[in-house]
């Protein structure tokens, strides 16, 4: 076993035990500061030399001193334990060496990162006299000697005597290191907690937008515009009034402009707006012709959809499962929402809401579309709420029937001259195959006017609406029928296709425009909305010439008459008004 690990001879002294310390640190730091080593000046014959060497963390092991005595008897190496004291925790005392070896030597190491040693000191005391080793030799050896990293059993056994003080020192260092780590971790946690914003506390009561009247929805992230209508505020009421919702917007600026427009409508040009008043000159002129509710409804329709519904129409929401559009109206059924149904398009749902609004709120209701679009009178008089299929039936029932201009009798009873209406013939088509008419399965509407006393032998007319009239108009020509005046027929009668269909005393006879006249075997005068097909075709001869009575007759907006002068054609007159 090599005991010359100090690098110089110890032969003058008898050595019974040798201690060797093993350090696992890769670097060695020597504090070379005057005054770091101390010895007892009161000792007469013994000199104790205190040499302080420091090693970096985590060991923090300090080899206190190597003492020797000038006496002849042998002495063991005294390895003084150390107690570590953090510079930040001066009040806490580390374990003392006298607790273990009964000595009074105490060494304080101020920091695990060894500094200049200005805040640390070594105090050594000995029982006997002796000389001190030269510090220069030890410093030179420590600088030149690498750290022994061999951790074998022999070194482990040799360092047993040092283990007590080393363990105490190491445990002290480890405890201080752990305490420092805990403190550092605590500071880090505190810093992270302080850096993390507390949403529930800091965001409470704070504005979510820099614009007036704009808030950011915390769930959807979209911006909503609203204003407070204080016109309905009661006396003594502490609230700001009624909140008017202006819609949801994707951009914060759009929501701010919606608020500005609504504020200008409610409070005039003297109100405070988010943007200059000069940017709203056109809108101010437009809003003069609208009420507050109508203008708010228009703002909602211009929005990018409500935050709680994906429709731009009032009272319309989209179902979250099947995606169909639902219509609801509020505050009509015991201050609750009334479900109006589910529709395929949002326009149909908006119409259902409008009908319900007109029914429950009258002419002052705010609707999605113009109120002239609906038959307001029929909706108000309807005993039930015409929504959906009922609304469609109501539209069909209230569809305006084409107006007719009646041919009236302007001839007085005393006048039997030929100046009055004698007879009339209608424009017809020649060379048209009648079988083509039966290929179109169209509906036949029978319009009639029972103005007076109709002859039972007169022909009855049925009219068919023909959508493909332009196919027949290509080969048409006008034919004036020359029907002689008969004495048995009064001058105020009207003849259609050679048949007398009316006599004196009736108010008139109407023929719808763009309809085809057919002779039918039977005709129900009370079947106004029934549909017919031609059942029988008849041909008759008239005194003026041969032409089919049941002909393809495209009655235009003109009718012609043949007067007594023979062959003279009077100016045309309107029989049917398309408007």
Swiss-Prot record:
InterPro entries in UniProt: AP2/ERF_dom, AP2/ERF_dom_sf, DNA-bd_dom_sf
Gene3D superfamilies the UniProt entry points to: AP2/ERF domain
DNA-binding residue intervals: 210-276, 312-370
Keyword Transcription regulation among UniProt keywords: yes
Subcellular localization(s) per the UniProt record: Nucleus
GO molecular function annotations of the record: DNA binding; DNA-binding transcription factor activity
Residue ranges, annotated region (Disordered): 149-177
Keywords in alphabetical order: Developmental protein, DNA-binding, Nucleus, Repeat, Transcription, Transcription regulation
UniProt note on tissues of expression: Mostly expressed in developing seeds.
This protein's record includes keyword Nucleus: yes
Domain of life according to the entry: Eukaryota
UniProt-listed Pfam families: AP2
Chief site of localization: nucleus
Any one GO cellular component localisation term in the record: nucleus
Low complexity: compositionally biased ranges: 165-177
Function summary: Transcription factor that promotes cell proliferation, differentiation and morphogenesis, especially during embryogenesis.
Protein's name according to its UniProt entry: AP2-like ethylene-responsive transcription factor BBM1
Gene: BBM1
């Amino acid at each position: 076993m090599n005991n010359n690990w100090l690098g110089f001879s110890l032969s003058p002294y008898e050595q019974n035990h040798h201690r060797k310390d093993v350090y696992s640190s890769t670097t060695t730091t020597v504090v070379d500061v005057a005054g770091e080593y101390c010895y007892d000046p009161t000792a007469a014959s013994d000199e104790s030399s205190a040499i302080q060497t420091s090693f970096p963390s985590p060991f923090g092991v300090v080899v206190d001193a190597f003492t020797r005595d000038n006496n002849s008897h042998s002495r063991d190496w005294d390895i003084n334990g150390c107690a570590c004291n953090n510079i930040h925790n001066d009040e806490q005392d580390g374990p003392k060496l006298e607790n273990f070896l009964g000595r009074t030597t105490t060494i304080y190491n101020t920091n695990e990162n060894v500094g200049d040693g200005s805040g640390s000191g070594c105090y050594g005391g000995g029982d006997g006299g002796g000389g001190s080793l030269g510090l220069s030799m030890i410093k030179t050896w420590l600088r030149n000697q690498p750290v022994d990293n061999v951790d074998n059993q022999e070194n482990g056994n040799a360092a047993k005597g040092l283990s007590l003080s080393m363990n105490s020192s190491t445990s002290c260092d480890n405890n201080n290191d752990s305490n420092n780590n805990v403190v550092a971790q605590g500071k880090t946690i505190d810093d992270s907690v302080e850096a993390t914003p507390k949403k529930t506390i800091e965001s409470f009561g704070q504005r979510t937008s820099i614009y007036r009247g704009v808030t950011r929805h915390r769930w959807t992230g979209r911006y909503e515009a609203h204003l407070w209508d204080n016109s309905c505020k009661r006396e003594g009421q502490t609230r700001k009034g009624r909140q008017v919702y202006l819609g949801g917007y994707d951009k914060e600026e759009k929501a701010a402009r919606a608020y500005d427009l609504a504020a200008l409508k409610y409070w005039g040009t003297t109100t405070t707006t988010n943007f200059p008043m000069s940017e709203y000159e056109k809108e101010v002129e437009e809003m003069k012709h609208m009420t507050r509710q109508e203008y708010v409804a228009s703002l909602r329709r211009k929005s990018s959809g409500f935050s709680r519904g994906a429709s731009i129409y009032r009272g319309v929401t989209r179902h979250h499962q099947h995606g169909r559009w639902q219509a609801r109206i509020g505050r009509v059924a015991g201050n609750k929402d009334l479900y109006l149904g589910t529709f395929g398009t949002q326009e149909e749902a908006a119409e259902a809401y409008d009908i319900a609004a007109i029914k429950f709120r009258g002419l002052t209701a705010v609707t999605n579309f113009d109120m002239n679009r609906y038959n307001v009178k029929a909706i108000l008089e309807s005993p039930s709420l015409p929504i959906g299929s009922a609304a469609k039936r109501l539209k069909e029932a209230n569809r305006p029937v084409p107006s007719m201009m009646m041919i009236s009798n302007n001839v007085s009873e005393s006048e039997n001259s030929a100046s009055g209406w004698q007879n009339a013939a209608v424009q017809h088509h020649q060379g048209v195959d009648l079988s083509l008419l039966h290929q179109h399965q169209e509906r036949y509407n029978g319009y009639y006017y029972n103005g007076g006393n109709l002859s039972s032998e007169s022909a009855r007319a049925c009219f068919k609406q023909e959508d493909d009239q332009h196919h027949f108009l290509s080969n048409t020509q006008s034919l004036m029928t020359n029907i002689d005046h008969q004495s048995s027929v009064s001058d105020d009668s009207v003849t259609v296709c050679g048949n007398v269909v009316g006599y004196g005393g009736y108010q008139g006879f109407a023929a719808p425009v763009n309809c085809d006249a057919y002779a039918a075997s039977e005709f129900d005068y009370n079947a106004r909305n029934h549909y017919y097909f031609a059942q029988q075709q008849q041909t008759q001869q008239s005194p003026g010439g041969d032409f089919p009575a049941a002909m393809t007759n495209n009655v235009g907006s003109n009718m012609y008459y043949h007067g007594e002068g023979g062959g003279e054609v009077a100016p045309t007159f309107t029989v049917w008004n398309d408007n």
